[in-house]
UniProtKB/Swiss-Prot annotation:
This is Chaperone protein DnaJ. Its cofactor is Zn(2+). Residues 5-70 form the J domain. The keyword RNA-binding does not apply. GO terms for molecular function: ATP binding; heat shock protein binding; unfolded protein binding; zinc ion binding. The keyword Metal-binding applies. It comes from Xanthomonas campestris pv. campestris (strain B100). Binds 2 Zn(2+) ions per monomer.
Length: 376
């Protein structure tokens, strides 16, 4: 059966960047890795296909050769031993899946592999995000199997793989290139289990809901992430666990809108307060504060209350609270109130009205000028 195009295997365009290739490989590895699909031969075959594609496309020289000649670039002189003469040694370029993606460095299966990182979205009210909180969460994850202590073996015995001699990797020759890849006999583990654990079926890990207590620092905002080292999935065959990344999302607030460390809100005032001036009380996250409204205040005027915003989670400086005044039209008026407003309105005549309502006069003049230009 002919091989599929490597770009098709990873689901990327031929011009994909290194980062796009890495992300595509990560998605494939997380979905089809044998540790996640024990006993599934089809998933294992797909995983190996993705790994082979990534090993070629992630290396500049091999990618150029593949782009020029396709699979034919690697079909001659294949062997199972060490690198042939004259060919560049690609020895340690390719680690195990978790070494490549998550930063493993040392050779060998136990050094290169680790558990997968886990993500969790934590929703908070604004007050909780501003003040900080300790929250208990429950996450589904893979933990080390207790009966076999993560070894995957019922009796605790494992055998060193005779093919790779425990390294988990073998070197093969493909055309002019020598490269290193996971051992197909032990799937990169370096060991073989003859008597699999009855609890985890040889995986060394079992699914379980883990309960954790998270201390959320004061001042966090949507998009901030909290890393809990070692609280991700247990690593295969007793290797180190991954990390847990908690992403914060702050719910919308009924009064305040957040912009970084600053807060914004609207403060409704009556027409009489706007015209005559007044002192109004406004809510802040720390209690109430006063704003002095000067006479003849218009809708949209901003008042700044310094230090009444959010204390920064990074610099510990405090943001400000910006209060936008909105002059509210009165409703549910009594007959007497309506009559008073009519009498008040009657006092605005001719040029006097323009003097008391400068924005209205400017608007009317603008409309008149527009129509004059349109009809001239």
């Amino acid at each position: 059966m002919s091989k599929r195009d490597y770009y098709e295997v990873l689901g990327v365009a031929r011009g994909a960047s290194d980062e796009e290739l890495k992300k595509a490989y990560r998605r494939c590895a997380m979905k089809y890795h044998p540790d996640r699909n024990p006993g599934d031969a089809a998933a294992e075959a797909t995983f190996k296909e993705c790994k082979e594609a990534y090993e070629v496309l992630s290396d500049g020289n091999k990618r150029r050769a593949y782009d020029a000649h396709g699979h034919a670039a690697f079909e001659h002189g294949m062997g199972g031993g060490g690198g042939g003469p004259g060919g560049p040694d690609m020895g340690d370029i390719f680690g195990d899946i978790f070494g490549n993606i998550f930063g493993g460095g040392a050779a060998g299966p136990r050094a290169a592999r680790r558990g997968a990182d886990v993500g969790y979205v934590l929703e908070l009210d604004l007050e909780e995000a501003v003040a900080g909180i300790e929250r208990r969460i429950e996450i589904p994850t893979l933990i080390e199997c207790e009966p076999c202590h993560g070894s995957g073996s019922e009796d605790g015995k494992v055998e060193v793989c005779a093919t790779c001699h425990g390294r988990g990797q073998v070197r093969i020759q493909r055309g002019i290139f020598a490269m290193q890849q996971s051992c197909p006999h032990c799937d990169g583990r370096g060991t073989l289990i003859q008597n699999p654990c009855k609890t985890c079926h040889g995986a060394g890990r079992v699914e379980e809901d883990k309960v954790l207590s998270i201390k959320v620092p004061a001042g966090v905002d949507t998009g901030d992430r909290i890393r809990l080292a070692g609280e991700g999935e247990a690593g295969p065959a007793g290797t180190p666990p991954g990390d847990l990344y908690v992403e914060v999302r702050v719910r919308e607030h009924a009064i305040f809108q957040r912009d970084g460390d600053d807060l914004h809100c609207e403060v409704p005032i009556r027409i009489s307060q706007a015209a005559l001036g007044d002192t109004v009380r406004v809510a802040t996250l720390g209690g109430e504060a006063e704003i002095r409204i000067p006479a003849e205040t218009q809708t949209g005027k901003l008042f700044r209350l310094r230090g009444k915003g959010v204390r920064s989670v990074r610099s510990r400086s405090e943001g400000d609270l910006y209060c936008r005044v909105v002059v509210e039209t009165p409703v549910n008026l009594t007959a007497d109130q309506r009559e008073l407003l009519k009498q008040f309105e009657a006092t605005f005549t001719g040029e006097d009205a323009r003097k008391h309502s400068p924005k209205s006069a400017t608007f009317i003049d603008g409309v008149k000028g527009f129509w004059d230009r349109m009809t001239s």
